[in-house]
Structures are given as structure tokens and as C-alpha cells.
Amino acid sequence: MKQKPNMNFWGLWNLSFGFFGVQIAYALQSANISRIFATLGADPHSLSFFWILPPLMGIIVQPLVGKYSDRTWCRWGRRIPYLFLGAAVAVAVMCLLPNAGSLQLDSTTLVWGGMTAVMLFGLLMLMLLDTSINMAMQPFKMLVGDMVNEEQKKKAYSIQSFLCNAGSVVGFIFPFLFTWIGISNTAPEGVVPDSVIWSFYIGAAILILCVIYTTVKVREWNPEEYNEYNGIESGASEEEKDNPGMVTLLLKAPTAFWSIGLVQFFCWASFLFMWTYTNGTVAANAFDTPISGGELDVTSDAYQVAGNWVGILYAVQALGSVVWATIIPRIRSTKMGYSLSLVLGGVGFVSMAFVTDPYLLFVSFILIGCAWAATLAYPFTLLTNALEGKGHMGTYLGLFNGTICLPQIVAAILGGMILKALPLAENGASNQPMMMVIAGILLIAGAVSVFAIKAK
């Protein structure tokens, strides 16, 4: 097997630059979905069910993108056609989703599963957005696995983590920024504010421009080059030589696949609770949002201001991740760096339940950012190193996405039930802040599980 060549900084940068735009879209979704669906009429106990869709689409789409991109060889490349198609669909959906409440759909009559027509439309748009973002996101991880040697992978994924967090900062601050320049942050009942709508519009434009940049700057290897650098016999692709099913590949997966997956379970369940309940936690603890009908009043100015502040907090988290991503490559012990990062994040989550000062929450989210940076960088470095020379890199990375999606699905299903089981908060509403304590406990459990990883 021929050694993969070293790439200069800009070569590694170009491989992942489109990820910046994809992450803006992902950040807008993460920070605003609970806010959007609460505005459309969802109650806090059902919010977690809307969060089933993102991981569900991920667990379906990403393995398929991995499997079929492993088999794709065309003039535009191997992975790039999939990321471009996904980005194009995402752009269209990002222009529709935040307008769900403005399309004159019925917002009072329950039509299916306790949802109104406007909520069903929003759910359909969310499903399409999740599908397209997953299709655009996965190829960037595969490009690094395909083209970067083992020595540079940690650096490549750190660059990807930096771009991911930089994109997150941009996406998270958009609603706050647009409100600051005078775009309305309130709207009639059932309608999403213009500050959020315009955030999605601008995010969509940046997404497609960034993806176009990567498609122009990156030349994927042809089949002969790929085979030579990945130890596959010449004359046939890895799929033609050996085309096992996904179940067979799972059974043959290295031990690291499963041990890393255990850590992933705790981490991603924790982050799902963060995305679902941060809006309610911040609105209740830091902005004294009034109560209406036994729950936080989502039409109040306090709730919408809190929603913008959540974007700022997520941006602080992303900035913390950017800084921490430059530090973790210097920690010699991979397991120690990984575990320490998750412990810091767990402390950040637990503190959220007790902090009432909006600015003091910056500390909580900086700590959470440490865990986020590690979750983006370490698992794929460890896994792709373990898979080196085994072939089917794209399929394995797609299957590994199950360790991201399944925990979120479990957390989304159980989230509402756990919230109902908790005692009410002092204001008489659902105790969303205590969900942050549970998230912190999960991250610390993940930190302990790191030491079970069988690394190459």
C-alpha cells in the first residue's frame, strides 16, 4: 500500500471548508427548532418528539450515502456529488421551514397525532431539512478518511472541528444580530419572528456558496489512485472485490467501533437534552418568563428574548469549542484529553440548572464547548485509524453515525416522560432546568466510558 501524501494546510482546509456552511444550517436548526415548534403550538412535554426526526433521518440517510458513495465514481468525484445535492435541497427547505406559521395553514384543528396542519407542515420541512443536511454533512468526514494519511488525520479533523464551530457561531448569533439591527423579534401568535426567518435565508445563501467552494477546490482521487493509497488490489474497486452487506460489516467491525460507540451514546443523549430544553431552561431561570396555562408563555417578549440569548450562548459554546480544539491535539494521551473534555462539559450542564444570571451562563457554555470539541474530533480520529486498510470507509462511517443517531432517538422518546416524572419547578411550570442535570450526569458517564476504548 502506497503511503498517502502529506497535504499542506490549505489542502486540508479546502477539504472541509464547505462544512462551515453546512454547520450554519445545522446551528440554525439546533438553536431554533424548539423555539419554532413552541411558537407553532407544541407543549414542552411533546417538544422532544420533534427532535426524533434529526437523528432518525441521520441513521437512515448517512449509511446510505456512505454505501452508495463508496460505489460512485464519476467526473465530479466520489463524495462531492452527494454533498452538493444535499446542500441544494437544504437551501430550498431553509426558505420554507421558518415560514410555516405564515402560510395560512390551520393552526387550531388537530388533524393527526395531536398536531395541527401547520405543525405537520413544519414537521415535513424539518424531515427534509434533516435529510438534506445529513446528505451534505457526511461526505466531508469521508473525504478526510479517503484522502488524509493517519499522521495528519487528527489535524484534519481539528480543522473540520474549527470550521464546524465557526459556522455554529455564525448560525447561532444570526437571530440576535438581526434583532439588534432592527428586524422584528416578535410576531403574532403562531408566527415565527422575522429575525428567525431572515436568519434562515442568509444561512441558506452562505451554505450553497461554501459548498460550491469545496466542489471547485477539491479534486478527489480516481479509482486507481484510491486503490493504490488504500491497499486495494488494482483493477477493481473495493466494492467489486468484496461487497458484504451492512450487517456483515457490523459483525466484522473492529472493537474500537463499539467501544467508541458506548461513549457516543452518553454524549449524544446529553446533547439532545441540551437542544430540546435549553430554551425553556434559560427562559425560566435567567429571564423570568411569565407563566400561561401552567407553562412558559411562548408569545411573551421575555421568551423570545431568551430565544435570542440561547443563540448567543450556543455561540459562546462554539467559541469555547474553537479554542479547546486547538488545545486537545497537544494533550499527549488521547483518552485523557477525551475524558477530561467530557467531564468539563458535564460540569457545565449541571451548572445551568442553578445559574440565574444570563452572563454567568457563558461559563457553563464554555465548559460545554470543551465536550463538544472533543465529541467532534476524537471519535472519528480513533475510528478511521482503526479502519485504515480495511476498505468500505464510507459505509463504516455511515454505520458509525448510528452511534450518534440512536442515542438521540432514545433520548427524544424518553425526554418527555422524564420531564413529566420530575417535580414541577418553583414557578409551577415543567422542570426543564433539571433536564440539564441529567444531561451532565450522562456526559460524566461518557467520560468514564472513554477508558474502555480499544484504540489502534
List the predicted regions and their residue ranges.
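Intracellular loop-helix junctions on the cytosolic face of multi-pass helical membrane proteins
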Residues: 1-9, 106-109, 113-125, 135-143, ...
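Helix-loop boundary and gating motifs at the non-cytosolic
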Residues: 2-57, 259, 263, 267-293
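Loop-to-transmembrane helix entry
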Residues: 43-53, 158, 194, 288-318, ...
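Loop-to-transmembrane helix entry/capping segments in MFS-fold secondary transporters
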Residues: 44-45, 119, 150-162, 389-401
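C-terminal ends and interior cores of transmembrane alpha-helices
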Residues: 84-115, 344-356
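Intracellular juxtamembrane helix-capping segments at the cytosolic ends
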Residues: 135-148, 374-389
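C-terminal transmembrane helical hairpin of 12-TM major facilitator-type secondary transporters
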Residues: 335-379
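A late C-terminal transmembrane helix in Major Facilitator Superfamily
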Residues: 390-422
